[in-house]
């Protein structure tokens, strides 16, 4: 099946066709490293991590670049407040970023460039825009002439007339037109600066990404990604500069993830309503946030709450539990008369999963297919326990279902990093083997009963207690767990 991708540029889903067959070049805007990362940053990281993983699953050779903005007004201001060099602030939060990314199992980008190591590339980029007549210098500042680029506004669907109504010139700016934006800013006392043909200064935010993309990926890339809030002005300004300079399409597909909100308001540091990623993984398995992010379509807003984290934690435990329970089921006695299997359900789940993912990376629908399989696995488990055994075919089908969940979850969704797929291990022969097997069976049934009680499946729990009693086993539920003994 072909992959469909929603393209912000065209406002519709399109068949994904890379520039070069078999290869995909992706750039996403990274963080400005002046503070800790919050759930909003985490969502964007997870979304594009999964997109990258799925493209790779489809057989593409993916080259992924994500930058660091390591010089910026916010970084400079923080450095002044802490009486530290701006580089110390940037290095501190780049280190924190890598810690967060590792904890949430975000795969490192192939290249993670910093602005400060690309100053010559940025200067060259700006000079070429000046040479083509799209930029001009005024007393050490360099601006992009928006009206010169006739297609300005095509990404965000805004007209120049609409934009001019709300535009204004900040005090001290010398630009010719309120719409024009800075490519290079003349230095101010006490701020970092680099030599340039226009005097000492530092680059403007919108230019940095363009220069780094041109250097590492070329003039046209397959996918440019980022948060929805970057569409305008940042990505609009990037597109204008890049296409003005190259006379080529800048990106074939623009993909934007929706924002994270809290009670309907955007999560942000300025509003003080943010939850740090460190707080998340100090309270939860990082997989829980990944699953929460994937439970909402990437283009939709995600309203964060601790209640939703708790709900997602339970869902994650069901998913993980279905994988783990193979180890319990294989300890049940063989029952050839147990005529059940999961092969049809596995095929439906895989088909549904890949159909959803190929429809604009629809992770909620993809997850629904996996949880339908989990439900069928639980049904088979309960029937096997009630029947007192399981057939070889049923057990093998459960193992395959477990492996499918593990493989998809790990390779595409980035889950289950600590779990291992089901591997058959030959039982070690010891003296009194029969007694050992009986003990394993009892403990396996008690574990199934405990799970049933936790899921409020009391009929199953009572049934297991009764069957164990018939086998001469007494179980006792205590505050520290379930104990058992022979009558």
Curated annotation (Swiss-Prot):
Name the UniProt record assigns to this protein: Cysteine--tRNA ligase
Disulfide bond positions: none
Required co-factors: Zn(2+)
Assigned keywords, A-Z: Aminoacyl-tRNA synthetase, ATP-binding, Cytoplasm, Ligase, Metal-binding, Nucleotide-binding, Protein biosynthesis, Zinc
Cofactor binding summary note: Binds 1 zinc ion per subunit.
The EC number(s) this enzyme carries: 6.1.1.16
Motif ('HIGH' region): 31-41
Residues of the signal peptide: none
Positions that bind Zn(2+): 29, 209, 234, 238
Subunit structure: Monomer.
């Amino acid at each position: 099946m072909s992959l469909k991708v929603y393209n912000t540029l065209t406002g519709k889903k399109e068949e994904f066709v890379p520039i070069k067959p078999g290869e995909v070049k992706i750039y996403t805007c990274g963080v400005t490293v002046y503070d800790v990362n919050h759930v909003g940053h985490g969502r964007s990281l997870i979304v594009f991590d999964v997109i990258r993983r799925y493209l790779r699953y489809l057989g593409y050779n993916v080259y992924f670049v994500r930058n660091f903005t390591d010089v910026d007004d916010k970084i400079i201001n923080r450095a002044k407040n802490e009486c530290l060099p701006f580089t110390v602030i940037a290095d501190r939060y780049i280190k924190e970023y890598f810690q967060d990314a590792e904890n949430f199992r975000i795969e490192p980008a192939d290249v993670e460039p910093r602005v400060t190591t690309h100053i010559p590339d940025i200067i060259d980029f700006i000079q070429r825009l000046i040479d083509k007549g799209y930029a001009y210098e005024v007393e050490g500042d360099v601006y992009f002439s928006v009206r010169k680029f006739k297609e300005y506004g095509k990404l965000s669907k805004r007209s120049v007339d609409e934009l001019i109504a709300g535009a204004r010139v900040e005090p001290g700016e010398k630009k010719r037109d309120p719409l024009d934006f800075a490519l290079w800013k003349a230095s101010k006392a006490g701020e970092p600066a680099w030599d340039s043909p226009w005097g000492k200064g530092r680059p403007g935010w919108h230019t940095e990404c363009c220069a780094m993309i041109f250097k590492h990926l070329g003039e046209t890339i397959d996918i440019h990604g980022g948060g929805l809030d970057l569409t305008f002005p940042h990505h609009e300004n990037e597109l204008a500069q890049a296409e003005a300079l190259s006379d080529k399409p800048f990106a074939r597909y623009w993909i934007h993830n929706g924002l994270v909100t809290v009670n309907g308001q955007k999560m942000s540091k300025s509003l003080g309503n943010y939850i740090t990623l460190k707080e998340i993984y100090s309270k939860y398995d990082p997989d829980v946030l990944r699953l929460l992010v994937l439970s909402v379509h990437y283009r939709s807003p995600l309203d964060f709450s601790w209640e939703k984290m708790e709900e997602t934690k339970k869902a994650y435990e069901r998913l993980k539990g279905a994988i783990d329970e193979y180890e319990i089921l294989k300890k049940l006695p063989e029952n050839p008369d147990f005529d059940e299997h999961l092969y049809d359900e596995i095929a439906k789940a895989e088909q549904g999963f890949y159909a959803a993912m190929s429809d604009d990376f629809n992770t909620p629908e993809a997850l629904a297919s996996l949880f339908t399989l989990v439900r069928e696995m639980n049904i088979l488990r309960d029937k096997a326990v009630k029947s007192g055994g399981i057939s070889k075919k049923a057990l093998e089908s459960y193992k395959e279902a477990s492996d499918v969940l593990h493989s998809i979850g790990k390779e595409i969704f980035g889950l289950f990093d600590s779990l291992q797929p089901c591997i058959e291990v030959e039982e070690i022969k010891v003296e009194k083997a029969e007694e050992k097997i009986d003990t394993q069976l009892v403990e396996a049934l008690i574990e199934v009963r405990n799970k049933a009680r936790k899921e409020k499946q009391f009929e199953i729990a009572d049934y297991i207690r009764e069957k164990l009693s018939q086998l001469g086993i007494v179980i006792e539920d205590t505050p520290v767990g379930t104990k058992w003994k022979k009558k």
